[in-house]
Amino acid sequence: MRRIDRHQNGGSGWIVDEILKHGLHINRYQPLSAKSYIPLLKEISNRKATINIQNKDDRCFMYCLGRALDPNPEKHNLDRVSKHLKQVCVDLKLDQIVMPVTMKHLNKVEKTYDVSVNVFGHNGPDIYPIRLTEATFTSEVNLLVTTNEETNHYVWIRDFDRLNFRVTKCKNKKYFCMRCIQHF
């Protein structure tokens, strides 16, 4: 109603005679959080820039951070939940994170573990930013959220530039801005 009053008082010359229909829609809020394994699109997984950890629980965020922050990373089968990965998560005290992690909890995680966390989404093969941190910490982790009808899943982006690189005639390495996803 205030909008209608402002419109009338703004000098438009129009007068509202009657309101024919008024509707109110209420939706249940479900914050974006991530749970168990979801396979990536072939267009994304073929770029070899992500590690999609095949977990059966809701700890994909913890496993992604563990892989990214591992001081002695494994050489093979990085997409599997191994004893080594579980031990890294215990050593770094990542097992204290409340799962599943929602976007509003990321600031607390960043301060607690001294790590910058950027989250990206995808629409088909196209990548876009969902949450870019303003804080600067000693480590930086980029995550991709993939979704299906039921749930979401975090995937560690190991090489952001390679993830966004498309096949072109130019063979030189391209560097991408995380905010606008443009290369230079």
Annotate each language-model stretch with its function:
Residues 1-184:
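Metal-dependent nucleotidyl/phosphoryl-transfer cores and adjacent nucleic-acid-binding surfaces
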